[in-house]
């Protein structure tokens, strides 16, 4: 099934010891200020003390909230998604690993409850998101340092704010940082139904770019295809269809893509390279297939293709906090204008985290699992 859509169409939019956690707090508070205690508390968090299967190592723990001082900010978490990077971090397969024990979650939105005397950029009532990965958002409350947070406007949907700081940021940076694309140019991507993939479709459309979106075949293929079209996808095809000779007919109506976005690797990434324009760039930001990216010598010599990688955490290290805040504001404007919506999602109460973890790790995941506090 090969589906096209014009840009002018409609857009819808096992146990942990308390002493371990106490030792964690004694090590110094780099991102948060929780310690464990034995009696029940209204402050709860999903904690892991070693790396492994999230379903086995994650536990719902009662934690103690420390006093707010100086540059501290007391935050009540509102919602936090479960992303692939969260799972990889818990498994120990990620480029950034917090000290153990740790609270899970890299992304989410919370509301400021109180601030310390030295806090100048935030006030009670403000919405905030993490400035960097590893903050530990799967909890009901926390005391963070002001520099660990970024304020976001409250006039955007809660689920959009909760999923703002990772996937849309990754999508935007990949679209604008590697090739100087102009309206009418095209982009090809795999894993198009992922959080990043859905953001790519919408942001590209807002920039006047056309998208060729590759997905794995599945039982509900038409439902998924229709949803991606509603987001603004120009073409949606399966991995198998991408290999068919008929695919070349797409390029009668649009130029060969100069940018490919790869989250899969293996044969899928090789197919993306095959359809790139000479001199084009493939950016790899994930490896779902757990297979290497392979490029033939002829692709590199005769087509002069470029292979790059992108990791948002590294981008943040290379850029100032103000530049990240500017990026967040750009994306918030797109949300306000109806040009960027949150991925299809399912809200799960924090205490039902096992259900959310299981759902997020199933094949052909169609709904983003968001923990609600």
UniProtKB/Swiss-Prot annotation:
Presence of the UniProt keyword Disulfide bond in the record: no
Catalytic residues (UniProt): 94 (proton donor)
Transit peptide feature range: 1-53
GO cellular component, one term: nucleus
Keywords: Acetylation, Cytoplasm, Fatty acid biosynthesis, Fatty acid metabolism, Lipid biosynthesis, Lipid metabolism, Mitochondrion, NADP, Nucleus, Oxidoreductase, Transit peptide
Reaction it catalyzes: a 2,3-saturated acyl-[ACP] + NADP(+) = a (2E)-enoyl-[ACP] + NADPH + H(+); (2E)-butenoyl-[ACP] + NADPH + H(+) = butanoyl-[ACP] + NADP(+); (2E)-hexenoyl-[ACP] + NADPH + H(+) = hexanoyl-[ACP] + NADP(+); (2E)-octenoyl-[ACP] + NADPH + H(+) = octanoyl-[ACP] + NADP(+)
Enzyme Commission number: 1.3.1.104
EC category name: oxidoreductase
Residues bearing the modification N6-acetyllysine: 61, 252, 267
InterPro entries assigned to the protein according to its UniProt record, in alphabetical order: ADH-like_C, ADH-like_N, GroES-like_sf, Mito_Enoyl-ACP_Reductase, NAD(P)-bd_dom_sf, PKS_ER
Any single biological process term in GO: fatty acid biosynthetic process
Binding site for NADP(+): 167, 193-196, 216-218, 285-288, 310-312, 368
SUPFAM superfamilies: GroES-like, NAD(P)-binding Rossmann-fold domains
Modification N6-succinyllysine, positions: 61, 252, 267, 316
A GO term, aspect molecular function: enoyl-[acyl-carrier-protein] reductase (NADPH) activity
The keyword Nucleus belongs to this UniProt entry's keyword annotation: yes
A Pfam family it matches: ADH_zinc_N
Subunit and partners: Homodimer.
Job description of the protein: Catalyzes the NADPH-dependent reduction of trans-2-enoyl thioesters in mitochondrial fatty acid synthesis (fatty acid synthesis type II). Fatty acid chain elongation in mitochondria uses acyl carrier protein (ACP) as an acyl group carrier, but the enzyme accepts both ACP and CoA thioesters as substrates in vitro. Displays a preference for medium-chain over short- and long-chain substrates. May provide the octanoyl chain used for lipoic acid biosynthesis, regulating protein lipoylation and mitochondrial respiratory activity particularly in Purkinje cells.
Family membership noted in the UniProt record: Belongs to the zinc-containing alcohol dehydrogenase family. Quinone oxidoreductase subfamily.
Protein name as it appears in the record: Enoyl-[acyl-carrier-protein] reductase, mitochondrial
Species of the source: Rattus norvegicus (Rat)
């Amino acid at each position: 099934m090969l589906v096209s859509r014009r840009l002018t169409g409609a857009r819808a939019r096992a146990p942990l010891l308390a002493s371990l956690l106490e030792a964690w707090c004694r090590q110094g508070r780099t991102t948060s200020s929780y310690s464990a205690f034995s009696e029940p508390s209204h402050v709860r968090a999903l904690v892991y003390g070693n790396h492994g299967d999230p379903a086995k190592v994650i536990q719902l723990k009662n934690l103690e909230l420390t006093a707010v001082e100086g540059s501290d900010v007391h935050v009540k978490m509102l919602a936090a998604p479960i992303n692939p990077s969260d799972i990889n971090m818990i498994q120990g397969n990620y480029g950034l690993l917090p000290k153990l024990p740790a609270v899970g979650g890299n992304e989410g939105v919370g509301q400021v409850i109180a601030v310390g005397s030295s806090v100048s950029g935030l006030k009670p009532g403000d919405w905030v998101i993490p400035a960097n990965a590893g903050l530990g958002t799967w909890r009901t409350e926390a005391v963070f340092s002001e520099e660990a947070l970024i304020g976001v406007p409250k006039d955007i949907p809660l689920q959009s704010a909760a999923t703002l700081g990772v996937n849309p940021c990754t999508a935007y940076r990949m679209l604008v940082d590697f090739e100087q694309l102009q309206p009418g140019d095209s982009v090809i991507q795999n894993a198009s139904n992922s959080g990043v993939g859905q953001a790519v479709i919408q942001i590209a459309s807002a920039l006047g770019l056309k998208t060729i979106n590759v997905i794995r075949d599945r039982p509900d293929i038409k439902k998924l295809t229709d949803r991606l079209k509603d987001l603004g996808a120009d073409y949606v095809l399966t991995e198998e269809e991408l290999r068919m000779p008929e695919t070349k007919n797409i390029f009668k109506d649009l130029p060969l893509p100069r940018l490919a976005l790869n989250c899969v690797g293996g044969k899928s990434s090789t197919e993306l390279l095959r359809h790139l324009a000479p001199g084009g760039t493939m950016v790899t930001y994930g490896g779902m297939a757990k297979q290497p990216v392979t490029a033939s010598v002829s692709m590199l010599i005769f087509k002069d293709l470029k292979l790059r990688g992108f990791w948002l955490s590294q981008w943040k290290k290379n850029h100032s906090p103000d530049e990240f805040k500017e990026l967040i504001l750009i994306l918030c404007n797109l949300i306000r204008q109806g040009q960027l919506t949150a991925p299809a999602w399912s809200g799960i109460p924090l205490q039902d985290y096992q259900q959310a973890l299981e759902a997020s790790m199933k094949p052909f995941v169609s709904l983003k699992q968001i923990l609600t506090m």
